Each structure stands twice: as structure tokens, then as C-alpha cells.
A protein has these predicted regions:
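Short, structured motif recognition centered on aromatic/hydrophobic residues
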Residues: 83-91, 101, 121-122
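Acidic, glycine-rich active-site loops and adjacent beta-strand->loop/helix elements
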Residues: 123-129
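Bacterial N-terminal signal peptides that target proteins for export
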Residues: 1-7
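Extended intrinsically disordered, low-complexity coil regions enriched in Ser, Thr, Gly, Ala
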Residues: 79, 96-119, 132-146
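Active-site-proximal catalytic alpha-helix in oxidoreductases
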Residues: 88-94, 130-131
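Acidic, glycine/proline-rich low-complexity segments that act as flexible tails and inter-domain linkers
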Residues: 19-81, 110, 136-166
Length: 166
């Protein structure tokens, strides 16, 4: 991110100080938006992840704040709950991202997603990503729910259509 900012500022030198000011304002706004969105979703957990990268890969932390949360998660068009459910789907499908999956299951609960929605999204991935990925996802959800003291009733009759939640 520092290199990108330096390149933008270098390009703006020919255009004058107003361009450089605008570029910095945009960068600062994106970072503020990213930090706010990350905090809304993860509480302090997201900041801890970013801070843990400062000694080895600070740029990765900046990308998480500025791009993932400052650009993508803060876009209009989808609620934070919907964004978290889609992220849970993707991380479940990957099958090898349990730490990140747990963070996003926690985040989904923080922004108002229902535990039953989270379970259904993970179950849906059994069809597309395979049963091992779905089993790993359910294990991650079980851990997050247990940590929060959440108990959900399993649906036992698949013939009963699911309730619409949105």
C-alpha cells in the first residue's frame, strides 16, 4: 500500500499539490472506512489479526484494512450479514481456512446473522465443495457457538421446507 501511495503521489507531482492532497484524502478515507467496518464486524478480533502481522508482513495487514474492509466489505448493495454469509460459504468451500472461518462465523453473529443461517450456508457447501469441507465448517461453527453459549435445534425433518429468514 505504501508503494501504491508513493506511485500515486509521484504521478500527482506533475499535476500539482491538489492531486496529491486528493490521493492522500482518498487513502485516509479508505483506511478509516476499513477500520470502522472491521471493528463493526469483528469487534477487537480483526484488529488483533492485523496487529499480529506488523512485525512480519505489515502490507498484508494494510491490504486487509484498505482493500478487504475499506473497499469490498464497505460497498453498498449487500448487508454485512449477507457479506459474512458469502464469506463463510467461500471459506467453507476452501476447506483449509478454519481460523479465518471461525473469525467470520463470529463476525456474522456480531452483525446479526442467525446461527441457523450460518449452519444452512455451511450445509449448502456440502453439495458444491464436498462433505469434508462442510464437516470442517460445521466443526468451526460448533466451536464458535460453544464459545458464545449458543445452542441451536437441529432440523430433523428434511421434508419441512426451511423458513425464509430474509
Amino acid at each position: 500500500m505504501k508503494l501504491k501511495t508513493a506511485l500515486v503521489l509521484t504521478g500527482c507531482m506533475a499535476a500539482g499539490p491538489a492531486c496529491a492532497d486528493t490521493a492522500l484524502q482518498g487513502q485516509n478515507a479508505r483506511q478509516e472506512r476499513g477500520e470502522k467496518t472491521l471493528a463493526n464486524i469483528t469487534g477487537g478480533a480483526g484488529k488483533q489479526v492485523v496487529d499480529s502481522l506488523r512485525d512480519i508482513a505489515p502490507d498484508l495487514g494494510d491490504w486487509i484494512i484498505n482493500f478487504a474492509y475499506g473497499e469490498v466489505f464497505s460497498r453498498p448493495g449487500l448487508s454485512l450479514c449477507t457479506r459474512e454469509l458469502t464469506t463463510i460459504s467461500a471459506l467453507t468451500a476452501l476447506g483449509n481456512a478454519q481460523p479465518q472461518l471461525k473469525v467470520h462465523i463470529d463476525g456474522a453473529l456480531n452483525v446479526g446473522c442467525k446461527p441457523e443461517e450460518i449452519v444452512e450456508v455451511i450445509l449448502q457447501m456440502a453439495v458444491y465443495a464436498g462433505f469434508p469441507s462442510a464437516l470442517n465448517g460445521i466443526g468451526a461453527a460448533r466451536e464458535v457457538f460453544a464459545k458464545r453459549g449458543i445452542k441451536i435445534a437441529a432440523r430433523t425433518d428434511p421434508a419441512v421446507p426451511p423458513q425464509e429468514t430474509r
